[in-house]
Every structure is written in structure tokens, then in C-alpha cells.
Amino acid sequence: MQASTEAEPIGLIGLGLVGKSIARRLLQAGHKVLGFDLSKEACRAAEGFGVGIGVDAREVGARSGVMLLSLFDSASRRSLLFGEQNLLGALRPGTTLIDTSTGRPSDLTEDHERLAPGGIRLIDAALSGSSKVIADGQAIALVGDRSADAGTYGHMLSAFSKAQYFLGAPGRGLEAKLVVNLVFGLNRLALAEALGLARQANLDLGLMLEILRSGETYSRVMEVKGPMMLRAAYEPPVARLGQHFKDVELIRHWAQDLGARVPVTDTHAHLLQELIDAGFGDLDNAAIFKAYDLRKGRP
């Protein structure tokens, strides 16, 4: 990929697991990155591999024509833009904000409409893939925009995603992401339940995973999450269980708004809540396997 020639750095707010992966890919592609995070530790870590660090979010906004947001949810974005940090007050007309976070689609649409009269474009570019997948450049970007309007930022998305799908309107990328996350989560849950049953029957779990991977039962989550489940190796997390619970709750709320039934996802949410209540929310989401430990009284 050719190096960037833009005079301004790309702004990046949020330097957690996903934000750091995005930053590394942008730097590798030759872009300049100016970032900020409320966590000083996260800022130091990103500065260590070449990210410029702003004094605050407003400095990043003032110096960037295109900004990426990698935040926890819609509330975090609204606090950043309209709350005490008041990023909006530092943005110039013509600035494009690309939100890679997973939040409520309706919130994104509302914020898009709120910002548009001031000449600020807010676009959702939800990423399908863990921080490791993003770091490898293998994520999928689900964009709430038209491809014809992506001229100012499409090359940036290409730095950390192997494919970009344009869904046409603000919020639609997030809707597609929630559908994708539903399948991801239930694939993990199905694998955990199958291995839990096999364990209870004293079957060889390594052999069972090989069998599941060899036929039509295969899913890609088996490649990484399966071995993690067998080893009970959930740290350091690639994607946190608590983060996925947040996504599952978004799916359930969206489904409720649509009048759609998601009974298996409802069950998944209850199992995740049990694990979070037991103190496992910061483990990798492969720790859904521990739900079957809890129900058998295992440690």
C-alpha cells in the first residue's frame, strides 16, 4: 500500500485494544496518526510505537480533517462530542468523523443529523473482527455511507480492513454489525455447549474439536476459540467477554425495537450475565465455556 501524502494527521480517539490495532495499521500504511485516550497508560503505549499524542481530544480534533473514533458505546461518543470534553467545539466544518465503535444504530443516526447542519459528517464504519484480526488487516468494515462518498476516507479504511461494504445510510453499518455479532456470539456459544457436553461424557476434547473442525460443523471461531477453551487460556483477552455482552444487549434492544424474536440470543445474554456476575467479564469471550463450569459447580 502506498504511503499517505496528507498534510494533516489522522485523528484517533480511543487507544484501547481495537484503537491500538487501528493505529498500528495506519502507521504501517504510511499515515500520520494523532491520538488521545483518557487513559494515560493507553496513551503511553501508543506513543511507544509511533502515535502522536494530543494534549486532549480537542487538540486532536483541531488538527485533523478526518477522525476515527474507537470507543465503548454511543454514550461514550456523546460524552466526547457534547459533554465535558466538548470535542465538537474544536471541529472545523468539513471534518469527517468515522466511528468504528459498536453502539445503538438509532443513536448514530440521531448524532449524524445533529452534526450535519454544522458541516460535520458522522459515519459509522463498524468493524467485524477482533483486535487481532484488525491488527492483521483482515477486518471487514461495514460502512453507513455510499461508496461514491468515501473519497476522503476510503483509503484509510483499507489500511485496517480487507473489505469494505457500503450500506448506504448512517446507522446501517451498525445494524449489519449487530447481525454479524449475533452469529459470531452464537457460534462461540454452540462450540462451548458442544465441548461442555463432550466433557461431561468423558470424550477426548482435543479429538472432538478436530472432528468438529473437519466437517460441515466447521466455523472459524473453532480455530482460535476452540484451543482457548480446551486450555482454559482466557488471558490476555483478544476480545473481552464483557464487551460482547454489551453487543448482545444492543442486539436484544434493536430486535425489540423491530419486533423481532431472538430467543437464543436471550439465553446467551443470561449466560454472559452469570459470568460477569462471577467476575469473568475481563476475560476473553472464549470464556463463555466457563458458563458450563458454573452450572456444574466447577471452579
Predicted segments — roles?
Residues 218-280, 285:
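Interdomain hinge/lid region at the active-site interface
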Residues 136-144, 165, 169-201, 210-224, ...:
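Active-site-proximal catalytic alpha-helix in oxidoreductases
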